[in-house]
């Protein structure tokens, strides 16, 4: 069956960009002076930017989870030992400079930045609705900032490219300092913070980035930099002024199809099957579900660790929506989950799509959105920033809001007709936190982020900005007597290596990170 790419943000319009554009392997590209003349040209270019985060095989989403979770104490690589061996290198901190997953991350994010630069450079002079063109420019700035944030937090300083350039020109650009990259990110996101709110877009544009996305990424940037003062101000704006978001009443709702792009969702990648005879949607759930259940065709990657499981209170109902277990059976499935090939006995609930919720004739392409940022993330960042700014009473308010929602979550999953384990949740489960001790509250908030956002790709980000990545990983290795984490070197492993292929193309103008 011929694979057809559908427009990510136009929600039904076939994208007319050529395959050479979509598959471009490097981070420089030739642009045509005659192309970006009309509003429709800019819209098409912006759609091309969004598509870098959602191509047919969803390599960005896979990379997001492999880097963000599998290189931490939350997730094992999973699958068979030889399958995607480069992810095992990430997991064990034995990463070579030729690692395919590392190179893939670099390529995808620079393709995203490239497309954004085309929009930003040409939108101001294009013919059409000037207000709409200005919005397109701000969307591109928000996406470019997301790309650079994802690069600088994993590679450190990188080439800072803010205008369309030829490949030959790109190859002469050295790495900018991390400070310079962060300055550009903050500038872009500050400008994009005046984008429309989540509810102000037309239905056909409901997945476009919003002011909430821009402000959330701005807050994450400040938090990563340890600038809690500015982070608090931005987060206060999101939570107390804009009020564009809220928590769903039940934690488990976040992964049910009827709640896609819900009031809690700040950013997600849509993967819709519009025509059951055309292979669209996403294949990520197949990578992350069990290899032993007919109809799932899973590869068994992204396996929750025992350490993550042990981080939960025994009566915390969120366990139901983080771990699938042998014996769980979803309504409509003929067979219960069988996780005997999983090293921990668990698989990733948040990427499990049962038969009753699948659409299309191609079982590899599932109508399922990738949830990247939720409002509970913002509330916990806000609690953390407030605590660091010596406002523990305010911090507890937002921490306890997240815990209250968890406490009131149904521990019995309505998507299942058999559930191997049901937490004994009561009204006294996850009681409100009362301490006002700054150090104690910090540890509690960090723990709450882990169990609330488990398997959602943000664990590495948290451990890095908390300056305890090595400490946590070495403790993990010692606790379980495993290789994972034992090799962690603080001078090396906070950053990934600059891909050797990119260094070769630049004639080593791109310098390498320490100890690689």
Tell me what each language-model feature is.
Residues 1-28:
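Bacterial Sec-dependent N-terminal signal peptides
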Residues 20-24, 50, 74-81, 95-99, ...:
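Long, intrinsically disordered, low-complexity segments
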Residues 20-84, 182, 190-196, 208-342, ...:
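An aromatic- and glycine-enriched ligand-binding surface/loop that stacks and positions planar moieties
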Residues 43-47, 51-57, 81-155, 176-180, ...:
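Conserved, well-structured interaction surfaces
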Residues 84-94, 310-375:
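Flexible, polar/acidic helix-loop-strand segments at domain edges
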Residues 144, 211, 218, 375, ...:
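Structural register within alpha-helical repeat arrays
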């Amino acid at each position: 069956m011929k694979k057809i790419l559908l427009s990510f943000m136009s929600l039904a319009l076939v994208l007319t960009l050529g395959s050479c554009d979509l598959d471009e392997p490097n981070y420089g590209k030739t642009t045509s002076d005659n192309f970006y003349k009309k509003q429709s040209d800019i819209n098409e270019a912006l759609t091309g930017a969004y598509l870098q985060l959602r191509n047919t095989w969803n390599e960005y989403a896979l990379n997001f989870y492999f880097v963000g979770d599998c290189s931490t104490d939350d997730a094992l690589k999973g699958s068979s030992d030889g399958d995607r061996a480069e992810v095992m290198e990430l997991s064990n901190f034995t990463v070579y400079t030729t690692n395919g997953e590392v190179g893939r991350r670099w390529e995808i994010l620079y393709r995203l930045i490239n497309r954004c630069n085309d929009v930003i450079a040409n939108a101001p002079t294009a013919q059409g609705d000037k207000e709409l063109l200005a919005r397109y420019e701000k969307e591109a700035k928000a996406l470019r900032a997301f790309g650079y944030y994802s690069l600088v937090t994993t590679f450190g300083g990188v080439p800072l490219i803010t205008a369309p350039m030829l490949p030959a020109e790109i190859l002469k650009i050295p790495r900018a300092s991390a400070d310079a990259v962060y300055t550009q990110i903050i500038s872009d996101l500050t400008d994009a913070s005046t984008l429309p709110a989540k509810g102000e877009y037309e239905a056909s544009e409901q997945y476009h980035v919003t002011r909430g996305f821009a402000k959330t990424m701005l807050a994450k940037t400040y938090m990563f930099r340890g600038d809690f003062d500015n982070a608090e101000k931005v987060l206060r704006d999101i939570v107390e002024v804009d009020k564009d978001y809220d928590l769903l009443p039940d934690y488990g709702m976040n992964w049910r199809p009827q709640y896609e792009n819900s009031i809690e969702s700040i950013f997600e990648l849509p993967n819709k099957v519009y025509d059951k005879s055309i292979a669209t949607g996403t294949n990520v759930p197949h990578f992350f579900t069990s290899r032993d259940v007919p109809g799932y065709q899973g590869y068994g990657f992204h396996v929750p660790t025992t350490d993550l499981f042990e981080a939960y209170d025994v009566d915390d109902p969120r366990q139901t929506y983080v771990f699938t277990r042998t014996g769980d059976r979803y309504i409509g499935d003929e067979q219960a989950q069988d996780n005997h090939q999983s090293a921990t006995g668990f698989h990733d609930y948040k990427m499990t799509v049962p038969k009753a919720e699948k659409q299309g004739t191609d079982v590899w392409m599932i109508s399922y959105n990738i949830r990247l940022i939720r409002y509970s993330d913002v509330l916990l960042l806000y609690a953390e920033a407030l605590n660091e700014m010596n406002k523990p009473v305010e911090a507890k308010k937002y921490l306890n809001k997240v815990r209250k929602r968890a406490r009131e979550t149904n521990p019995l999953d309505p998507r299942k007709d058999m559930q191997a384990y049901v937490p004994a949740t009561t009204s006294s489960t996850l009681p409100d936190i009362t301490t006002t001790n700054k150090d104690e509250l910090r540890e509690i908030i960090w723990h709450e982020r882990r169990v609330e956002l488990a398997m959602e790709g943000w664990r590495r980000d948290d451990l890095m900005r908390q300056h305890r990545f090595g400490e946590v990983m070495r403790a993990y290795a010692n606790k379980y007597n495993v290789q994972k984490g034992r090799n962690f070197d603080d001078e090396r492993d906070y950053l990934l290596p600059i891909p050797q292929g990119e260094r070769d193309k630049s004639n080593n103008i791109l310098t390498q990170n320490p100890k690689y």
